Amino acid sequence: MKRNFPKLIALSLIFSLSVTPIANAESNSNIKAKDKKHVQVNVEDKSVPTDVRNLAQKDYLSYVTSLDKIYNKEKASYTLGEPFKIYKFNKKSDGNYYFPVLNTEGNIDYIVTISPKITKYSSSSSKYTINVSPFLSKVLNQYKDQQITILTNSKGYYVVTQNHKAKLVLKTPRLEDKKLKKTESIPTGNNVTQLKQKASVTMPTSQFKSNNYTYNEQYINKLENFKIRETQGNNGWCAGYTMSALLNATYNTNKYHAEAVMRFLHPNLQGQRFQFTGLTPREMIYFGQTQGRSPQLLNRMTTYNEVDNLTKNNKGIAVLGSRVESRNGMHAGHAMAVVGNAKLDNGQEVIIIWNPWDNGFMTQDAKNNVIPVSNGDHYRWYSSIYGY
């Protein structure tokens, strides 16, 4: 289960964030006066279907609120920014549509990702699926009022500014300083210049929406002690990170670490053979058994009710995913952890997932077995190991 990014993915946009009053805003007695403003977001926006916009507008606040409650945040108000796309170096979009979610301070807290249904693999009956996570929010907040291109490869995420210099803004924990110096100066070729699209100011939602009602109505169920203690670097240890996070949560401890788990299971591997090794489901079950658990393999995605019951009983679930885009090479398979589940105020059932690559959680439609991840790929949730 090794991680593999496409060589480079580019996000081309101009981000200009400012809070300004708007005329003719709808009145809402539940929203404070300072919330009746909007944030202008400059993005590259082409051919976004009306259905996508409507879905984002209708459901974003419910999904955002579920994560707020998972993070134990207070009630807040948000507005939905205009959509942008992520482009690969062949200048084609990755197929998803992204919407920034802005707070009343003008900062991005979350990114809404809307993906067209992948008919061959998806169990969802909907034309589009919606997921919410922090994703690139911190990176975008660092580059207000600048035209940037964001690139990513196996070493992390780069921002290329208007002076064509690349800066590594999200590095992998295992990246050595020597390698870091070499990668900071790339890429600077014509491909980067050509990917910079001209953009104009676009209007986000006309007013902020308070999540007060949504917050009170939602049902949230979470592994009580689940925390993100470490994230996956330039290695193939996704299963190690997943099991460590689950066991730390269910035992309420900090003693499990991915590298130690991998060393326990593969004691004779050295160098890159160790760095890029993965685990089989059998090895994952065996490790759980050595730690006093009785993990069970389920050859499908867990249902919402199963997640609800297992989480209530303090039993962790590992997601086993198969990459839709390519079944070959590094990270054709990937492991993730189930944090919990939520029933939104609109009745939608979602599963909360942690991808070891990320510093935050993401929402997943409980009826959709295809998970979009932060590098633009999609993983089919084909099996589960529960009982950690």
UniProtKB/Swiss-Prot annotation:
Reaction catalysed by this enzyme: Broad endopeptidase action on proteins including elastin, but rather limited hydrolysis of small-molecule substrates. Assays are conveniently made with hemoglobin, casein or Z-Phe-Arg-NHMec as substrate
Regulation: Prematurely activated/folded staphopain A is inhibited by staphostatin A (ScpB), which is probably required to protect staphylococcal cytoplasmic proteins from degradation by ScpA.
Signal peptide coordinates: 1-25
PTM section of the record: Cleavage leads to the activation of ScpA probably by an auto-catalytic manner.
Keyword annotations from UniProtKB, A to Z: Hydrolase, Protease, Secreted, Signal, Thiol protease, Virulence, Zymogen
One BP annotation, GO: proteolysis
Broad EC category: hydrolase
Entries under Gene3D superfamilies matching the protein: Cysteine proteinases, Staphopain proregion domain
Other remarks in the entry: The catalytic maturation of ScpA appears to reside outside the cascade of activation started by the metalloprotease aureolysin (aur).
Function statement: Cysteine protease that plays an important role in the inhibition of host innate immune response. Cleaves host elastins found in connective tissues, pulmonary surfactant protein A in the lungs, and the chemokine receptor CXCR2 on leukocytes. Proteolytic cleavage of surfactant protein A impairs bacterial phagocytosis by neutrophils while CXCR2 degradation blocks neutrophil activation and chemotaxis. Additionally, promotes vascular leakage by activating the plasma kallikerin/kinin system, resulting in hypotension.
Protein name as catalogued: Staphopain A
Gene name in the database record: sspP
